């Protein structure tokens, strides 16, 4: 590892230089406020005649795929933002909406810092962002009608475009200010420096990364670029889509049924890392397992297994909004898909859990006990089933009925009394909606997941 102070603009410069934002990095997410602050700092640099402005650190590592290509481990937000600023400056000069004392300034910036005109089309840009951002960036080099308006890159490019038009600085002053941005460049060596450990230390506060971000970095970061892209496309991106991008919660549920305890949401990354290392997991096999469970997660959330009876119960459980039971449902449905329990046992198990949840809700039993119950319920059931060489469903029912204290299963008498005494219109809205669904559709032959009740 080698660190040195240098001008930020030097990272974009040079023959065959191309900066790669690895697929494990999050999308570009600097806000307009961040861009405003940068531009204000550049104005201040010139107005106060300062020699330079410190702009943070950048961590980069040469890739195995190509000479001159560097992978940006940390600092992609700053690098991308300044690239957008230079592109906005170039386009305004080329459109002759602003002028420069140097008639070649636009071309000089374009060929030195933005594009390598000698490279093939797919490698021409000196910056390669992650998948969706890359498409947006390429369109910014085209006409405005081609811009990807939903992209944050486009929004910030437009901000710079308009801000430059205000001419607080001339084109020459702005470029001079950009050249004064200083960074600490930390260069890592393949095979010698652990990029993951360095990234962790730089982001130890965890303020700007979700637990899922950190897990994604962990599983992808130390892989060659082509392997990263393959793992991202074949597994991680599918996991994101299947979980509706709520990957941190999904990972917590995955860990819960594997660890048989509920990790704190802010500790999901650390728990995942320990789990992976303890089991000496092959990364691709681990991602494949996660992707498979993410498909089950999607089917649970959407009540879309394709089996009508199963989907009806899942739909009702979704009405109750009891996400706490997912650490039980995920391995249960997986067990069924592996033909380790039959369809009858699956339906029966789902209905037993449904009854358990609704009875407790009607009797106003505390919900804080449910986390621990469902963290271990599947493993408890499997253990007793194997020990007694008996069926899954009777064992599951036995475990729930014999829970004690705050975890117990309400008796018939308790449930009936609560049902008689409860003010239905004052109860939990999800439980009320569930109750109306059951009363109205008890014998309904047509199943629809989009029913609504007022």
Tell where the protein language model's regions lie, with residue ranges.
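Amphipathic repeat-derived elements
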Residues: 41-47, 55-60, 393-401, 408, ...
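A cross-family structural signal marking well-folded subdomains
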Residues: 211-216, 220-443
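Short, solvent-exposed coil/turn linker segments
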Residues: 6-11, 405, 411, 448, ...
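Histidine-centered nuclease catalytic patch
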Residues: 75, 433, 445-454
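Glycine- and hydrophobic-rich flexible loops that cap the catalytic core of alpha/beta enzyme folds
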Residues: 2-265, 367
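Positively charged, low-complexity intrinsically disordered regions
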Residues: 109-111, 127, 433, 439, ...
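Charged, solvent-exposed alpha-helical segments that act as regulatory interaction surfaces
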Residues: 95-98, 362, 445
């Amino acid at each position: 590892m080698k660190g040195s102070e240098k001008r930020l603009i030097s990272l974009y410069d040079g023959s065959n230089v191309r900066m790669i934002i690895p697929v494990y990095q999050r999308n570009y997410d600097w806000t307009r406020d961040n861009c405003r602050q940068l531009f204000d700092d550049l104005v201040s640099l010139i107005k106060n005649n300062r020699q330079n402005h410190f702009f943070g650190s950048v961590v980069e590592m040469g890739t195995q795929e190509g000479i001159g290509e560097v992978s940006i481990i940390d600092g992609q937000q700053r690098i991308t933002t300044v690239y957008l600023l230079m592109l906005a400056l170039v386009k305004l000069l080329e459109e002759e909406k602003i002028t420069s004392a140097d008639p070649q300034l636009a071309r000089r910036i374009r060929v030195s810092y933005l594009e390598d005109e000698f490279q093939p089309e797919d490698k021409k840009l000196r910056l390669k962002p992650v998948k969706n951002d890359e498409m947006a960036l390429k369109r910014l080099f085209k006409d405005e009608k081609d811009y990807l308006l939903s992209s944050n890159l486009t929004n910030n490019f437009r901000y710079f475009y308009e801000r430059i038009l205000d001419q607080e600085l001339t084109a020459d002053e702005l470029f001079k200010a950009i050249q004064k941005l200083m960074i600490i460049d930390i260069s890592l060596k393949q095979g010698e420096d652990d990029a993951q450990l360095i990234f962790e230390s730089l982001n130890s506060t965890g303020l700007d990364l979700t637990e899922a971000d950190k897990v994604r970095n962990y599983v992808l970061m130390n892989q060659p670029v082509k392997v990263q892209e393959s793992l991202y496309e074949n597994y991680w991106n599918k996991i994101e889509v299947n979980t509706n991008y709520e990957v941190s919660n999904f990972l917590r549920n995955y860990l819960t049924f594997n660890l048989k305890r509920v990790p704190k949401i802010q500790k999901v990354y650390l728990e995942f890392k320990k789990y992976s290392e303890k089991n000496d997991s092959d990364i691709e096999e681990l991602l494949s397992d996660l992707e498979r469970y993410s498909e089950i997660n999607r089917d649970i959330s959407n009540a879309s297994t394709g089996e009508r009876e199963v989907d009806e119960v899942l739909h009702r459980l979704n009405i109750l909004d009891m996400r706490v039971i997912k650490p039980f449902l995920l391995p249960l449905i997986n067990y069924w898909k592996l033909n380790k329990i039959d369809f009858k046992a699956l339906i029966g198990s789902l209905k037993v859990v449904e009854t358990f949840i609704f009875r407790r809700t009607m009797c106003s039993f505390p919900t804080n006990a449910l986390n621990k119950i469902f963290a271990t319920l599947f493993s408890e059931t499997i253990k007793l089933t194997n020990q007694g060489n008996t069926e899954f469903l009777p064992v599951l029912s036995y475990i729930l009925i014999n829970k004690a204290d705050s975890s117990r299963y309400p008796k018939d008498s308790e449930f009936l009394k609560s049902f008689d005494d409860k003010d239905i219109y004052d109860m939990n809205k999800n439980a009320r909606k569930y109750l109306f669904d059951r009363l109205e559709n008890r014998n309904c032959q047509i199943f629809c997941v989009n029913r609504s009740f007022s």
